[in-house]
Amino acid sequence: MNDLMTKSFLSYVELKKQARTDMESDRDLEKGEDFNFDFSPADEENLSGFFQEIETIKTLIEEITHLLLDLQNLNEETKSTHSTKILRGLRDRMESNIVTISRKANTVKTLIETLEKRNVANRTSFKEGSCVDRTRTSITNGVRKKLRDTMSEFHRLRERIFADYREDLKRKYFLATGEEPSNEDMEKMISGSGSCSDLVKTFEVKPEMDLKTKERHEAVNDIKRSLNRLHQVFLDMAVLVETQGDRIDDIEANVANAGSFVSGGTNSLYYANQMKKKTKSWVLWVSILGVLILLVCVISMLASR
């Protein structure tokens, strides 16, 4: 079943085949239950619409992934460019990507929430634990896992952009002063709340450096604000993903409990059989003892005559 979660982005036919294969393997985990793994025409119709929804979500997540990759490449370009005009263009493209990612991420969140509600409502026609229900639940979990991985990629990229800018300021400060900046100086430069006197004096000597640094600082601040807004969107989505993670843990716990119940039932049956054998043994010995006593009595009566 876990394999299905990592393979949930296959084509319609492949998804259907993988769902059947993975659920057949689940019989090893849930022995004693007899599931029908052949999809009926009604199952096919139900899953057909479901897989179309999955494909829509899949496409959106792939687009977000590509935008994140483009965002990473644009960030690399900002570190090497010396033109303020090019830097402004890169900033605008990065902000455009961030806005698009935010919009698509919100759409994915809404679609997954809707899909979850439909999965629950679908149990009125296809009971919980049925082949269709297990397929829908497992593939939905796979979508959530993919979304969580994409969110992790964004968080890593966000931290890398901030770290790169911090190192850039630190390097400029050292070139201007010959000293390493203190944490307080770094925070002032990053926040824009103040500046370091030695660095300012250096820029006064080279005003073109002042212009470039100011332009870069404004560009990075704009990008930071956009990244923080997107970060908040992903934080809201994290609640959705982590809640499902708790549910998955509950499912695993239920499977473990089911295994313990099966094991306990097997042990109880074993002890019951042992007790049954012991009871039969006691009945046999009592019967033999009764026969012996009867024989002794008969022999005694015959001897007394």
Curated annotation (Swiss-Prot):
Stretch forming the signal peptide: none
InterPro entries in the cross-refs: SNARE, Syntaxin, Syntaxin/epimorphin_CS, Syntaxin_N, T_SNARE_dom
Domain t-SNARE coiled-coil homology: 210-272
N-acetylmethionine modified-residue sites: 1
GO terms assigned for molecular function: SNAP receptor activity
Gene Ontology biological process terms from the UniProt entry: intracellular protein transport; vesicle-mediated transport
Coiled coil: 52-119
Pfam family, one: SNARE
GO CC terms of this entry: membrane; nucleus
Protein origin, superkingdom: Eukaryota
Role: Vesicle trafficking protein that functions in the secretory pathway.
Subunit structure, interactors included: Part of the t-SNARE complex.
Similarity field: Belongs to the syntaxin family.
The protein's name: Syntaxin-112
Organism: Arabidopsis thaliana (Mouse-ear cress)
Lineage, uppermost ranks: Eukaryota, Viridiplantae, Streptophyta, Embryophyta, Tracheophyta
